[in-house]
Amino acid sequence: MRKIIAFAIALTLGFQGIVCAQDNKEEEKNGLQFTEQKRLPVTSVKSQDRAGTCWSWSSISFLESEIIRLGKDSVSLAPLYIVWNTYNEKAKKYVRMHGNLNFGQGGAFADVLWAIENYGIVPLSEYSGLNYGEEIHAHGELDAILKAYLDAVVKNPNKKLSTAWLRGYDAVLDAYLGAKPEKFNYKGKEYTPVSFYKEATGLNAADYISLTSFTHHPFYTSFPLEIPDNWIGEKSYNIPIDELMGIMDKAIDNGYTFAWGTDVSEDGFSRKGLAVVPDFDNYEMADAEIAKWVSMPKIMKMAEWLKNPGKEKQIDQQMRQEAFDNYQTTDDHGMHAIGKAVDQNGNKYFIVKNSWGEYGDYKGYLYASYSFVEYKTLNIVIHKDAIPKDIKKKLNIQ
């Protein structure tokens, strides 16, 4: 979940400049009209700004909704507390692997659950992660320094690693993100990060599992999803796409949101707040317009499709697999699915909370069609109780 930082930067800068072709769509007109069927409780929309940390913001948003679902007081949690701990653990593994590990701002949902289980969590009010003279998150300099530091350690110029390298590395994290709080007061009670996690949130990290759907591994088994940002090697349960779609659909009906890993590099992903998979080959038009349509650039086809919405592609398991195998689907972005809606033609959508601030037509939310979700979902993280008993039995989930 790394490439999306370029688009997030554009959003932070008010869309100055053209990035990833999305800004060419400035005059897109949206002909879709939505009726929301269900919207589950969430905290406010936040922004990752100019940092590639969507994995932390989206996971934290998901867990904030879980806290509400579990009957605890709503609280905004600190994504950068997770980032500090993840950077620390990733550094240790990077050095252990002699530099043969993906290192950068990106991460995965599993990182957040691992960090909370091991280091707890704190409210956003206790840890902003802004300790470097900026009002917004911008991690380019930090990431470059950390990578250069670790590469110098891995070169091992003294022929033996010192006992100081990790202390020095953590000092850089403290300088940029701030020292982690050891104790803090929240609503009149003193907590440590671990006691806050265990006493105030109602969360149990072990209750959350990752689901995916690809054919290069057997269904109803688990495997580490082969994406660069899965540095921690977390396993996902593999099920057919129709079952995964059914779980997501029923989860919302039953009051469960989920963290959603996807790829937003498709032409059908619009910064206006839409994610669709247009079937340009079968777009209905007058015969006289066909020749013009065939030669039209995709960006213009997309604009026309949005003005006069047509059909979407029919997605199947093979299409998903081919897109993953040929790098058309990559670990691009993490978001938080929080509801369901239909358009004026009866087509279904998930309501998705993003972490780019209150941008676009829907103020930080977007509508992702079921076709898009079916095609571009890498994995989801969800509470195990949202999974039907028959599927849990197949997966041997207790």
Task: Label every model-predicted segment.
Residues 1-25:
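Bacterial Sec-dependent N-terminal signal peptides
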Residues 24-31, 312-315:
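Short, positively charged
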Residues 29-259, 360-362, 370:
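Active-site nucleophile-adjacent alpha helix/oxyanion-hole segment immediately C-terminal to the catalytic cysteine
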Residues 167-398:
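Active-site signature of cysteine proteases
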